[in-house]
Each structure stands twice: as structure tokens, then as C-alpha cells.
């Protein structure tokens, strides 16, 4: 079990309470409170400094010899039997990653995520958010697993290269899921693995918007094939212009521009990262297309009026271009 903690407060203590009896590694990414001293009595604690989520996860993975790596956020409460259910699902050789059913901690009759969803533009959000918890009753394939609570086989984690540390924060789980799909593995959500998550849907702050947007573009540029990028170019451009307008209205256009500037400055790294990612590919775009949706969910994203028309246009475009995949 690997928990990456950053100023997690009492949430970390609550999380460790739910993991009693498990072999837990806590990566201290910047915690300074009494929760770290408490964690040291119940888990192996590694002081990493604020190296970012992905780097913290990679460090934690190196500190455990387990064949199955289970990652949970410090703001989760893992229910009895969840870890065993995740491990059982990974016994299927074609399954690489398994997400737990995530319920809202403060409204446990509702889902936080039944598997995360990816738009053709790379925008992503927790699927099933707010739905009744019993709406997820059977394991199923998903686009990618939420980083809040998931398991992956160690050999697959190594094969995929672990988390990309350059992302630093946000979208690491999205990229890992895409690399698993490129390699031909399946990604599942398993309702028998039950986890509560202290998640609140709210508008991101400016710094979070920077990482979300920059990293979304890193994933799109590295994971999509050239053909898919060309076919989706009008959609990607329209979404990018729309997001720039939203950023201007909401006051985070500077952060949006910082993301573009980072990509330009680091274009050599991005090209190298794309080559490494595409080298994993064992399946074609037709197989991957089923994990992309052309419909933006207005419940999850703060979208302008007219989104229904945009969804209709993008859906029509996606239906048309998929025949060329």
C-alpha cells in the first residue's frame, strides 16, 4: 500500500486507521503536522520533500517488494475487503489496472467515480459522479482509473515506466491509463473494492488550472497517434480557443498561457516523451477510440451556454472521422 501525503492533516490518520494490518508506505511529500509523527508509528514513512505526486508514487513503489502495488490518496477511507478485491481482479493476465468503486465520504450513498471519463480533447472527469452508489454493480472496462484508489501489477507498472514525473501534479493517472491501453491491457473498475473519498466538486484554483491544462496537452500530444491528431485537429483547436475564452473570463488566462509556453520551451522533451509513449503501442486507434467520448458533461465542467450545440457538432464530427481510424 502506498500513500503519498502532502499536508494531509487528520485525513491521513483516518486513512491509516482504515489500512490497519496492511503493509503501508507513506511518502511524505511535505507534511509537517502531527499526522506524520503518528504515521511513523504505523507505517514506513519516507521523507521525500515536495517532489510531486508521480515522483512520490514512484518512490513508494521502489520501497515495497509487493507484486501488486496499491495506491490510495490520504483523503480516502478503505473499506474491509477492498484491497483483496483489487488483487483478485489483477489475477486476469490482460488486466493491468483496477480502480476501486469510489463513494463520496460525506454522502456515501453517492458515487465519486465509477471509472474516469476522457473527452476526445483530453479533458477528463470522474464518471458517474453523484449517481447512486449501487448503480455500479458489476466490474467493467473504463478509460482510466482514478488515482485516488487503484491497483496495478508491479511488472506492468515497470513495463509502462511508472508515473511521468515531469507532470508533477494532476493527470498522472490519465496518462498511466492511456499507456496501459496503448500496450493492449484492460483497465477495470471493481465495485467489490469499496473506498470512500473526501471529494468535493469545485472550481479549481489558478495553479491547479495550470497543471490540469498543461498536462492534458502533454497527454494528448504524446498518447494520440498522428492520424488521430489530424482527424481531431478542428475539435482540438475549437476546444483550445473555448478554454482560452473561459480562462480569460474566469481570470486564469495567464496560467493557460504558461502551459502553452512550457510546452514550447520543453518541446524536445515532449518529442522524446512522445516517442517513448508511442513505442508502447500494440493496438491501433480503432481499439482506443471506444474509450473517448465526444460529449462534455456540464455537471462536471463549468461550461458556457451553448454546450449542447457544441456536443452535437463534436459528436457528428467524431462519428464521421472514426471510419478513417
Feature names for model-found ranges:
Residues 69:
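Short aromatic/hydrophobic "clamp" motif used to bind/position activated sugar donors
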Residues 16-49, 59:
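Acidic donor-binding segment of Leloir-type glycosyltransferases
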Residues 119-142, 158:
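Short, flexible, basic/aromatic active-site loop/helix in glycosyltransferases
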Amino acid at each position: 500500500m502506498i500513500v503519498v501525503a502532502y499536508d494531509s492533516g487528520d485525513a491521513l490518520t483516518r486513512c491509516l486507521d482504515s489500512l490497519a494490518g496492511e503493509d503501508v508506505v507513506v511518502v511524505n511529500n511535505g507534511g509537517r503536522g502531527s499526522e506524520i509523527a503518528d504515521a511513523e508509528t504505523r507505517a514506513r514513512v519516507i521523507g521525500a520533500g515536495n517532489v510531486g505526486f508521480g515522483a512520490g508514487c514512484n518512490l513508494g513503489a521502489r520501497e515495497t517488494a509487493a507484486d501488486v502495488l496499491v495506491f490510495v490518496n490520504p483523503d480516502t477511507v478503505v473499506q474491509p475487503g477492498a484491497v483483496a478485491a483489487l488483487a483478485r481482479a489483477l489475477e486476469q493476465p490482460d488486466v493491468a489496472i483496477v480502480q476501486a468503486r469510489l463513494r463520496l465520504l460525506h454522502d456515501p450513498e453517492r458515487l465519486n467515480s465509477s471509472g474516469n471519463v476522457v473527452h476526445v480533447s483530453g479533458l477528463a472527469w470522474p464518471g458517474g459522479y453523484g449517481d447512486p452508489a449501487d448503480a455500479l454493480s458489476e466490474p467493467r472496462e473504463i478509460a482510466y482509473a482514478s488515482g485516488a484508489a487503484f491497483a496495478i501489477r508491479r511488472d506492468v507498472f515497470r513495463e509502462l515506466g511508472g508515473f511521468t514525473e515531469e507532470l508533477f501534479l494532476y493527470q498522472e493517472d490519465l496518462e498511466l491509463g492511456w499507456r496501459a491501453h496503448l500496450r493492449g491491457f484492460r483497465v477495470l473498475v471493481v465495485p467489490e473494492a469499496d473506498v470512500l473519498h473526501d471529494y468535493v466538486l469545485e472550481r479549481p484554483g489558478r495553479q491547479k488550472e495550470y497543471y490540469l491544462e498543461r498536462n492534458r496537452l502533454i497527454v494528448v500530444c504524446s498518447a494520440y497517434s498522428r492520424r488521430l491528431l489530424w482527424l481531431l485537429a478542428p475539435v482540438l483547436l475549437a476546444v483550445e480557443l473555448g478554454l482560452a475564452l473561459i480562462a480569460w473570463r474566469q481570470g486564469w488566462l495567464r496560467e493557460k498561457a504558461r502551459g502553452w509556453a512550457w510546452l514550447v520551451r520543453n518541446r524536445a522533451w515532449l518529442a522524446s516523451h512522445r516517442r517513448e509513449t508511442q513505442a508502447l503501442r500494440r493496438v491501433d486507434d480503432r481499439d482506443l477510440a471506444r474509450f473517448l467520448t465526444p460529449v462534455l458533461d456540464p455537471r462536471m465542467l463549468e461550461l458556457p451556454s451553448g454546450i449542447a450545440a457544441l456536443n452535437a457538432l463534436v459528436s457528428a464530427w467524431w462519428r464521421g472521422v472514426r471510419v478513417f481510424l
